[in-house]
């Protein structure tokens, strides 16, 4: 895929940051000294960590140059590293690894969660939030349009960049032997957006990228028009004209 766009991602900054706030509220450490925000994106989640633990050394890690550029502008003086999370190694003494909306993009992510949990300092916390929305209409319709002509051949592998998440019990069995405390919950957000077009703008920053990035501009416009029409039919307006984007997410907080 092309590099992520911080500008596109931040069009819905408040809504995207809310799950990070909810995840952070359940991290029970009061005074960690070394905190890492993996998949830090444009720094919106990193900023929460800096405010929660001003005394800590907070480092952001991401594989997108554009996201890191925005993060450095947002939090000058803080350390940001460009790295692939699948190969990144937590520094010795890391007490918190915060991973908001990133592991769903990492192949075999459960293995890497186990690896990072094992690398934490004693009593350290791995805090994870992942979208669990591949079975939502917003994503089903991406695939349906992609399977049609003229996009079928070019987008034949687009859906393979993300796998359906395992059930909570799978995470529990894999992580419980490695930790002293484990909390897992699954919730559904209903984001009130201005229109069906706003839903399309939201997913263009994340889930729609594998479907539109490979296309040239004319094909991309045609794909987006077909997708937008289906979204408009699938998400009727509420009484006030807003549309509700249903968005399931899974949360995991594990203490070593």
UniProtKB/Swiss-Prot annotation:
Q: A GO biological process this protein is involved in?
A: methylation
Q: Which keywords does the record carry?
A: Cytoplasm, Methyltransferase, S-adenosyl-L-methionine, Transferase
Give yes or no: UniProt keyword Transferase: yes
Q: Where in the cell is it found?
A: Cytoplasm
Gene Ontology cellular component terms for the protein in this record: cytoplasm
MF-aspect GO terms: trans-aconitate 2-methyltransferase activity
- CDD domains for this protein: AdoMet_MTases
Q: Quick one: where is this thing mainly located? A: cytoplasm
Reaction(s) the record says it catalyses: trans-aconitate + S-adenosyl-L-methionine = (E)-3-(methoxycarbonyl)pent-2-enedioate + S-adenosyl-L-homocysteine
Sorted alphabetically, which SUPFAM superfamilies does this protein's record hold?
S-adenosyl-L-methionine-dependent methyltransferases
Q: List the disulfide bonds.
A: none
Q: What is its EC number?
A: 2.1.1.144
Q: Which domain of life is it from?
A: Bacteria
Purpose of the protein: Catalyzes the S-adenosylmethionine monomethyl esterification of trans-aconitate.
Q: Which family does it belong to?
A: Belongs to the methyltransferase superfamily. Tam family.
Q: What is this protein called?
A: Trans-aconitate 2-methyltransferase
**UniProt organism field:** Rhodopseudomonas palustris (strain BisA53)
């Amino acid at each position: 895929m092309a590099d992520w766009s911080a500008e596109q991602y931040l069009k819905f900054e408040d809504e995207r940051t809310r799950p990070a706030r909810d995840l952070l509220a359940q991290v029970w450490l009061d005074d960690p000294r070394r905190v890492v925000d993996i998949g830090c994106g444009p720094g919106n989640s990193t900023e929460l960590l800096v405010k929660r633990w001003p005394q800590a050394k907070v480092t952001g890690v991401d594989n997108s140059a554009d996201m890191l550029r925005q993060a450095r502008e947002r939090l000058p003086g803080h350390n940001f590293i460009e790295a692939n999370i699948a190969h990144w190694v937590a520094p010795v003494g890391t007490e918190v690894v915060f991973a908001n909306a990133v592991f769903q993009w990492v192949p075999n992510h459960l293995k890497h969660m186990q690896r990072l949990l094992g690398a934490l300092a004693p009593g350290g916390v791995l805090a994870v939030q992942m979208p669990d929305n591949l079975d939502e209409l917003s994503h089903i319709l991406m695939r349906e349009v992609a399977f049609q002509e003229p996009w079928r051949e070019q987008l034949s592998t687009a859906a393979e960049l993300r796998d359906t998440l395992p059930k909570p019990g799978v995470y529990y069995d894999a992580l419980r032997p490695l930790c002293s405390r484990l909390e897992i919950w699954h919730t559904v957000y209903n984001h009130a957006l201005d229109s069906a077009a706003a839903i399309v703008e939201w997913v263009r920053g994340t889930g729609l990228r594998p479907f539109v990035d490979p296309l040239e501009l004319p094909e991309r416009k045609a794909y987006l028009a077909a997708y937008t029409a289906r979204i408009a039919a699938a998400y009727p307006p509420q009484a006030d004209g807003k549309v509700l984007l249903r968005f399931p997410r899974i949360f995991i907080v594990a203490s070593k």
